[in-house]
Amino acid sequence: MSSAANHERYMRMAIDLACSEIDRTEGRPFGAVIVNDGKVLGSGANRAILDNDPTAHAEIVAIRDACRKLQSHRLDGSVMYSSCEPCPMCLSAMYWAGIKELYFGCSSQIADHYGFGDRLLHDELCKAPESRQVKSVQLLEQEAVRAFEAWVKAGGTADSVTDWK
């Protein structure tokens, strides 16, 4: 099977997951599949309403599924197939997980047309914290930095999206 055919196969899996949610009143029409070396590592459909969890978007559910199965917080080199262009939260999670490629079906503009707009989030992320609609105030920085100092003293090493390659 050609590479293009494989991409289409996995995308159809994501679309099928999105369509499977239509019959459930709690579901939303989003699905995602994570693949590495031709193996499906995880998959998920949007469960935000069903689980009372606003972070349970299809991509996040798929990342959680794959990480749980692999017993790892990293999915380095994996590919995400999503029925729709991911929102900023889901895209950020992909970076944190080490996912290297994304294929998506509908654009965010199409999602917006059907009432699932996330333009506000894109716009808000470009603003300084004090200019955002969610009030953001930095407080007790010197005390808060102690957690990082303790982490370093304990020999901890951190993941950083700045290390993403």
Placement of each model-derived feature along the sequence:
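Short beta-strand scaffold segments in enzyme catalytic cores
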Residues: 30-38
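Zinc-dependent deaminase
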Residues: 1-23, 95-165
